[in-house]
Each structure stands twice: as structure tokens, then as C-alpha cells.
Amino acid sequence: MTYRAAQNLIKRGDEPALRAALDTGLDPNLVNQNGWTLLMLAAVEGNLPIARLLLEKGANPALCNNKEETALTLATHRGFAQFAEILA
């Protein structure tokens, strides 16, 4: 599965399809050309269930994008303070 396809699942909030992709080999730390991880996408969408799923499957919350932002930084800047509980 490509980053773009995974991104679409996250934007749609399609947790079952994302889980199936992760179960069949999708890397939970997949990044795009800007260094954005799937966890970062979930964070900016404010989607806690998908963020929890990605963490459960091995997503690394400490990874930074090309601007040195983490998923926690991105979520906090968008007002999703509840992400601090699962990402810190």
C-alpha cells in the first residue's frame, strides 16, 4: 500500500481498512517526501482511535518530519491536547 492510499484511509477514518493494511504488512512508520508519518496524519485529523491503532502496531511517536515536528507537536498546535496522553 502506498502512503497516499494509507493517507486516504486515515482522512476517511477507516479504522478497519487501516487495521487490515497494517496486519498485512503496511509499515506503521511509513513516511512521505516531507517526512510525515501516518501517526502525524492521524494527529492533525484529531483521530485518537487511529492514532492508538498505529501506536499498537508499532508507530514511533518520536519521529520528526522535515520541519522537526512530531505527531504530538502537530496535534497540540491544532488544539488536540488529548493526544498528549497517548503520545507523550
What is the predicted function of each stretch?
Residues A17, P49-I50, Q82-F83:
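Conserved ankyrin/ankyrin-like repeat signature
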